[in-house]
Curated annotation (Swiss-Prot):
This is Iron-sulfur cluster assembly scaffold protein IscU. One of its GO terms (cellular component) is cytoplasm. A scaffold on which IscS assembles Fe-S clusters. Subsequently gives the nascent cluster to other proteins. It is likely that Fe-S cluster coordination is flexible as the role of this complex is to build and then hand off Fe-S clusters. GO terms for biological process: iron-sulfur cluster assembly. Transmembrane segments: none annotated. PANTHER family: IRON-SULFUR CLUSTER ASSEMBLY ENZYME NIFU HOMOLOG (PTHR10093). GO terms for molecular function: iron ion binding; iron-sulfur cluster binding. It comes from Buchnera aphidicola subsp. Schizaphis graminum (strain Sg). Gene3D superfamilies: 3.90.1010.10. InterPro entries: ISCU, NIF_FeS_clus_asmbl_NifU_N. Forms a heterotetramer with IscS; each subunit of the IscS dimer contacts an IscU monomer.
Length: 128
């Protein structure tokens, strides 16, 4: 199976690798995994007072497609509102990265990670 140039670019030069402090009330963290292949993805967002995602980062342990999917979505969600980020679907990730059918689960993980990070952020905001 050959990876697309976009997958290879994001795999070899991943964007936004890292982590934010979980104690920051403006940070939402999403940790998701796929038992089928062992991929684990942690995606974090930092949201400003206007509800715009001003920064995002990730740490992914998995295949090239999982890393590329994480890297891509961190680029996509920066500057978006929570609502806009929630609307990102795995099918858009598949299309952009030209993922083969056997790697579609990686794009689903990325979509799930976005939703989990947003859910965590919202639950922190509701507590304050």
């Amino acid at each position: 199976m050959a990876y697309s140039k976009k997958v290879m670019d994001h795999y070899e030069n991943p964007r936004n690798v890292g982590s934010f402090s979980n104690s920051d009330s403006n940070v939402g963290s999403g940790l998701v995994g796929a038992p089928a292949c062992g991929d684990v993805m942690k995606l974090q967002i930092k949201v400003n007072e206007q509800g715009i995602i001003e920064d995002a980062c990730f740490k992914t342990y998995g295949c090239g497609s999982a890393i590329a999917s994480s890297s891509l979505v961190t680029e996509w969600i920066k500057g978006k509102s929570i609502t806009e980020a929630e609307a990102i679907k795995n099918t858009s990730i598949v299309e952009e990265l030209e993922l083969p059918p056997v790697k579609i689960h990686c794009s689903i993980l990325a979509e799930d990670a976005i939703k989990a990070a947003i859910s965590d952020y919202k639950s922190k905001k509701n507590k304050n």
